[in-house]
Regions:
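M14 metallocarboxypeptidase catalytic domain recognition
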Residues: 1-180
Length: 180
């Protein structure tokens, strides 16, 4: 448990890597040191300084765990309370949840969905148009999750859409009167 060594796979058809997500199976209440190696070649090596990984026992509630970075290796030091623990770069946002968000948002009269194309994996690239386009209205673009490891952006978009599509929110109604 004191010398688990891992490396991060490169993104699909790319030389970049930064994001990780894995499950540890072990005895509970035993201290572990998980070393993620070769990070000086990652997409953003400076991002590992003062970084804290996230962990979860149920894949719903995530919490931060202490880490140390020596310039090339990230050491996650943690004593799990249960036999199965999930670790990630940031709280994962599953493709299933992504599809649920798209399905939910298109039920609003203020939102429509368009397919712009496909990813390298053959999945739809979706555009959500929120509001009713009219001459004189401003057009605002918000992009998120353009890279595989940017799960935090989709969490932001989920909250953004919940607020923007809330029929009882005065600020959202005002924004949609002024912009699309």
């Amino acid at each position: 448990p004191l010398n688990i060594q891992l490396s991060i796979r490169k993104d699909n058809q790319s030389e970049f890597y930064q994001w990780f997500h894995f499950k540890l199976e072990s005895q509970s209440f035993i201290s572990h040191q998980i070393k993620v190696t070769d990070l000086k070649k990652s997409a953003y090596p400076e991002g590992w300084q003062n970084y804290r990984a996230v962990a979860s026992y149920d894949r719903q509630e995530w919490f931060r765990v202490d880490c140390e970075f020596d310039g090339d290796t990230l050491t996650i030091a943690h004593t799990p309370e249960f036999e199965h623990t999930y670790y990630a770069y940031f709280a994962p946002y599953s493709y299933e949840r992504h599809l649920d968000l798209l399905s939910w948002s298109q039920q609003s009269p203020d939102c429509r969905q368009e397919c712009l194309g496909e990813t390298l994996d053959g999945r739809d690239i979706s555009l959500l148009v929120v509001g009713q386009p009219q001459e004189g209205k401003k057009v605002i673009w918000v992009t998120a999750r353009q890279h595989p490891g940017e799960t935090m952006a989709e969490w932001l978009i989920e909250g953004f859409l919940e607020r923007l599509l809330d029929q009882d929110d005065g600020l959202s109604r005002f924004l949609l009167d002024e912009a699309v």
